[in-house]
Amino acid sequence: KTLAELHPEWVFPSFSAALMYGLWVPYSRLNPIRICAPNAPYRRRSKHLWVSRLTPTDVHLEGEANVTGLCQTLLESALDAPVHLALPTIDSALRYLLISREDLLEYAQREGYRRRGIGRARAAFAHADGESENGGESMVRGIIIELGFMPPTMLQAELPDPLNQGHVYRVDMLWELDDGRCVIGEVDGA
């Protein structure tokens, strides 16, 4: 916010914009702060600041900062990170009902042509799920996908307690296997 006050002409893209939207952003993506400065003499990267000439297609005022539009924010985040680091941000946008997965895929098709990382971004959009309850669950699901394992068939599944009729257990991830067995994945406790 301080940078936005000092430089009102700057536009914040990618994970920096996602943070302003209140989306889940992995800690490792908080730095460097990303900035679009169309008048910047060149693309500059440092440990704390990443300035590019990227021209935002859609700019919104979020709080007191200019940020890229939500679709561009999510696309830039997904282009800029592996699936497991992009999924928390995308999942939270879906969870908060800010956008649909179909709109994201359509935007990626239209705006992502020939962009570096577009295949990875499309994969993140295709696997995004607003049922994820926190960024940790999203990251674990992303790692499972990146490693080539079958993604969960259901998130936040409710299972009956066989010993206590009427009581249910809720699990973070559920895999329903072809042979009828189920595998449960729990990220943050029981």
Predicted features, each with a name:
Residues 94-190:
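Surface segments flanking catalytic/ligand-binding clefts of nucleic-acid enzymes
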Residues 1-117:
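Short gly/ser-rich loop at a beta-strand->alpha-helix junction or flexible surface loop bordering the NTP-binding
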